[in-house]
C-alpha cells in the first residue's frame, strides 16, 4: 500500500547470546539508547496484567506507541483495534508453547498476492514458567513483539486504514 517502499523497518537492536537450560539462544532487544526517542503509550511505565480481568488501554500516540507489561499468567490474548473495524490479535499460549499473530483483519491486506495476510505462529519452547516481560512497538506499518527481554521476537507488517486507538489484554 505504499508507492515506493514496503518492507519491515525495525529499531536498532543489541544481540546477545544467553544460555537457557541446555541451549544457547540469540536474544535481540532494542538498544537502551532507543528509549530516549520513545514516549510510553500510557502513564504507567510497566503494567502488570492479572488473570481476573481484561484491561483496555487507550493508545495515546496511536500507531507510534510502545507498550510494555509483565505477564504473570500462562496464556493471554491481546487485541489492537480501531473504530474502522481493523484489528490485530496476538495470543501467547505458554501451555502449548506458541505465540500466534493474526493480521487477517489488520486493514489493507489484499494489495499483493505476495503479502500473506494470514496467521503466523512462533514456537516458544524455552519460555519460563514465571512472569515474563512483553514489549510491543507499534508504528504506522509494523508491530514488533519482544517476549522475555528479546528471547523471542516477532515483526509483522500491518496497514490499518486508521490508527489503532486501544489495546485490550
What are these regions (language model features)?
Residues 1-169:
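Beta-rich accessory regions
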